[in-house]
Design a protein with these regions (language model features):
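Acidic, small-polar-rich N-terminal luminal/periplasmic segments of exported/outer-membrane proteins
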Residues: 1-105
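Soluble non-cytosolic domains of exported or imported proteins
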Residues: 6, 14-18, 117, 154, ...
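A short, compositionally biased micro-patch
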Residues: 25, 37, 47, 77, ...
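Membrane-spanning beta-strands of outer-membrane beta-barrel proteins
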Residues: 37, 89, 119, 154-156, ...
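Residue-level marker for the onset of beta-strands and adjacent loop->beta junctions
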Residues: 38-40, 49, 122, 147, ...
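Outer-membrane beta-barrel translocator/receptor signature
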Residues: 69-72, 83-161, 167-171
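Acidic/polar loop-and-plug regions of large Gram-negative outer-membrane beta-barrel proteins
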Residues: 143, 147, 159-228, 234, ...
Length: 276
């Protein structure tokens, strides 16, 4: 059986969601996990996945924390999905539908958030008319990360201009460019003993602020042509070209016997060019 939950932009703004994990916590049938401190990792019906993510129906499986500043809605599907997306999944998928320019309208929406740890978030969403049958929409996002743990900090920057052209009453063209620049400290948490975290170590960070770092720089070009076939059907042609450069390196507690903590670490660079 399949079930779908849809979280809209209004829901995201009203609840103050800032990342995929925030949405997952409010969605039945799925859970979120740590993702080693550098990526979205969702558990669909008991099976963890870092790959079953889509953007406008196109696979988006590079491992990073996805921002919500340019999202119109998030679709969470639990159940079989190979016929819908051309590949099998672990038990579900998450599809982000991005914001498109609105022809004939001019508006600007500003969001600002801050928490008690000093983290802050700023987002601007502006749409303006460029012609009788065209419009441009620009979304910009920047945040500074902080929490209760020592050394934890980071920043994220996102820019996404979109142009919409209404070619005819039946045909619409959307062209999008997205740039992302992320950096953050990696905190893998504290050791466990007998299946539970050792709370006596809760104030200790097992890592090095000069080593436990992840960075991401990405550019994504998207083009989509939508043609209305009838009152109940339409045809879509989507093309995505993207480039990702990501670095993930960390030290973490790999073993603990109650008195001695064993440390380990690794370096994981990713360079990915996609054309879909």
């Amino acid at each position: 059986p399949q079930t779908v939950s849809i979280v809209t932009d209004d829901d995201i703004r009203r609840q103050g969601f800032r990342q995929i994990g925030d949405i997952i916590r409010y969605t039945p049938g799925v859970n979120t996990s740590q993702g080693e401190g550098h990526r979205d990792a969702v558990v669909f019906r008991g099976v963890r996945s870092t790959a079953d993510f889509f953007q406008d129906g196109i696979r988006d499986d590079v491992q990073y924390y996805r921002s919500l500043y340019n999202v119109e809605q998030v679709e969470i599907l639990r159940g079989p999905n190979a016929l819908l997306f051309g590949r099998g999944g672990t038990g579900g998928i998450i599809n982000r539908v991005t914001k498109k320019a609105v022809v004939g309208e001019t508006f600007t929406v500003n969001d600002f958030g801050v928490d008690s740890f000093g983290a802050s978030d700023v987002a601007i969403d502006t749409n303006f008319v460029t012609g009788p049958n065209s419009a441009m929409r620009i979304n910009v996002h920047s945040d500074d990360l902080a929490n209760h743990r020592d050394f934890y900090d980071g920043s994220r920057l996102g820019i996404n201009p979109v142009v919409t052209l209404v070619v005819s009453p039946e045909t619409t063209v959307n062209l999008s460019y997205e740039y992302a620049d992320h950096e953050r400290f990696i905190d893998r948490g504290i050791p466990t003993i007998n299946g539970r975290p050792d709370e006596s170590l809760s104030d200790i960070v097992f890592g090095d602020p000069d080593i436990n770092v992840t960075t991401l720089e990405a550019t994504i070009f998207r083009g989509m042509v939508s043609h209305k076939l009838s009152e109940t059907s339409k045809a879509n042609l989507s093309v995505t070209s993207s480039s990702f450069e990501k670095l993930y390196q960390n030290l973490y507690a790999s073993g603990y016997d109650g008195t001695l903590v064993t440390m380990d670490g690794y370096l994981d660079p990713t360079e990915r060019d996609n054309f879909i």
